[in-house]
């Protein structure tokens, strides 16, 4: 059985005080919780502090990051490399988020290169895909997700997805309070897994597919009860220790 992964994407939120309070609280809330991997992706400036706080709490939390460059060193002002992330113990790296696609004009092909570079450096890509509201209303969701995934598969092979995490995040549900129903999310997750299975059933069987988009303690159980939803990529609710821990506990219970 696939082990669920619940990851918090803190986006552009944080301060020393907030990171300390949040991770201290999360360490306490996760005491004794088993059957789920819990990860956080703080802003880059707080990765060092997060690493220390996670260690103080007994390393119950996986450290991640929100981006990576395509180079490990050199004249690339403002960027951070996989080697730097590894230096701070970060392993799960978010790529392809709709905010990066929109605000930084990151293409499917560029994101596929990031995916491959993370794999080459021994890190776990958390590969975000998803459709806009207009694409959803036009019935294009499955085609959009397939295009985004195939950017990786067609260049690097389906085996590249081994050990990776896919996060399906309908753009219209991110930070809006709207959310896909559990049944609709399951339908898309099943189509993603079927797309991969058509090329390699073993890869499809092991790949983690998270749902993201206004996941909260109140709706988490419904999502995690679906057979192809293997966790969540959580935004706003991950900024509250009790809420985020409740989501993680729901994943552990549903997949036990």
From Swiss-Prot:
Keywords: Cytoplasm, Gluconeogenesis, Glycolysis, Isomerase. One of its GO terms (cellular component) is cytosol. It is found in: Cytoplasm. One of its GO terms (biological process) is glycerol catabolic process. GO terms for molecular function: triose-phosphate isomerase activity. Substrate binds at residues 9-11, 175, 214, 235-236. Pathway: Carbohydrate biosynthesis; gluconeogenesis; Carbohydrate degradation; glycolysis; D-glyceraldehyde 3-phosphate from glycerone phosphate: step 1/1. The keyword Cytoplasm applies. InterPro entries: Aldolase_TIM (IPR013785), TIM_sf (IPR035990), TrioseP_Isoase_bac/euk (IPR022896), Triosephosphate_isomerase (IPR000652), Triosephosphate_isomerase_AS (IPR020861). Belongs to the triosephosphate isomerase family. This is Triosephosphate isomerase. It comes from Vibrio parahaemolyticus serotype O3:K6 (strain RIMD 2210633). The lineage of its organism: Bacteria, Pseudomonadati, Pseudomonadota, Gammaproteobacteria, Vibrionales.
């Amino acid at each position: 059985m696939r082990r669920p992964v619940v990851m918090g994407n803190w986006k552009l939120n944080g301060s020393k005080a907030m990171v300390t309070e949040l991770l201290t609280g999360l360490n306490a809330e996760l005491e004794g919780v088993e059957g789920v991997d819990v990860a956080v992706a703080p802003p880059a400036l707080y990765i060092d502090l997060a690493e220390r706080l996670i260690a103080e709490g007994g390393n119950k939390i996986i450290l991640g990051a929100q981006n990576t460059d395509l180079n490990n060193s050199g004249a690339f002002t403002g960027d951070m490399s996989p080697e730097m992330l590894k230096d701070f113990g970060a392993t799960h790296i978010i790529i392809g988020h709709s905010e990066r696609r929109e605000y930084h004009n990151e293409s499917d092909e560029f994101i596929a290169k990031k995916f491959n570079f993370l794999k080459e450096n021994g890190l776990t890509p958390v590969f975000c895909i998803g459709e806009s509201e207009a694409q959803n209303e036009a019935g294009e969701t499955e085609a959009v997700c397939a295009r985004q995934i195939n950017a990786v598969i067609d260049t690097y092979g389906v085996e590249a997805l081994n050990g990776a995490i896919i996060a399906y995040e309908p753009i219209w549900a991110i930070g809006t309070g709207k959310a896909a129903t559990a049944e609709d999310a399951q339908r898309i997750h099943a189509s993603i897994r079927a797309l991969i299975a058509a090329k390699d059933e073993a890869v499809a069987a092991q790949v983690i597919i998270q749902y993201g988009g206004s996941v909260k303690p109140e709706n988490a159980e419904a999502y995690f009860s679906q057979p192809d939803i293997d966790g969540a990529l959580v935004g706003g609710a991950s900024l509250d220790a009790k809420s985020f821990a409740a989501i993680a506990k729901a994943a552990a219970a549903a997949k036990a």
